[in-house]
């Protein structure tokens, strides 16, 4: 029972302090701003605006499902942590941005308005080092021929 008795006066003291500070707080804007979001009237007003139209979810595009599919093709018995998946997703986004930027530069240099598979292939050769570029080009060519044949 003693802890409850101690808690009640502690709860009343901030209320008394708020009541004591109420008169000077009228001139202070930060105190008034802190109290405004706490009121239910304003939250209800915002809710009325959202009732007519629901807030659309922002779609976040990731490569997570594709990374997982490739992992299962290569190592069917191995899993991947969410942190490792996030790192892989960031890695793919980074490589994509580098390749797209390089392809855009190549198109600009050649005064062409379109990025074709040729610009992508050249950008892969420029961005990726040595043997990795050769493998990437061969896999990319294979994927493009498979896509065009179907």
UniProtKB/Swiss-Prot annotation:
Main location: nucleus
Location(s), subcellular: Nucleus; Chromosome
SUPFAM superfamilies attached to this UniProt entry: Histone-fold (SSF47113)
Region (Disordered): 1-58
Assigned keywords, A-Z: Acetylation, Chromosome, DNA-binding, Isopeptide bond, Nucleosome core, Nucleus, Ubl conjugation
Sequence positions bearing N6-acetyllysine: 7, 34
Glycyl lysine isopeptide (Lys-Gly) (interchain with G-Cter in ubiquitin) crosslink site(s): 146
Family: Belongs to the histone H2B family.
Protein name, per record: Histone H2B.2
Gene behind this protein: H2B.2
């Amino acid at each position: 029972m003693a802890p409850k008795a101690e808690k009640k006066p502690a709860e009343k003291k901030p209320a008394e302090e708020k009541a004591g500070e109420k008169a000077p707080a009228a001139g202070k804007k930060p105190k008034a701003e802190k109290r405004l979001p706490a009121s239910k009237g304003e939250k209800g007003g915002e809710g009325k605006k959202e009732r007519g139209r629901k807030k659309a979810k922002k779609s976040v595009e990731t490569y997570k499902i594709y990374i997982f599919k490739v992992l299962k093709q290569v190592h069917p018995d191995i899993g991947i942590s969410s942190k490792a998946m996030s790192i892989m997703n960031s890695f793919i986004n980074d490589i994509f941005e580098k390749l797209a930027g390089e392809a855009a530069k190549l198109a600009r240099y050649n005064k062409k308005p379109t990025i074709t598979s040729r610009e992508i292939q050249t950008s892969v050769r420029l961005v990726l080092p040595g043997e990795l570029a050769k493998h990437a080009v061969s896999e990319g060519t294979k994927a493009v021929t498979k896509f065009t044949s179907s």
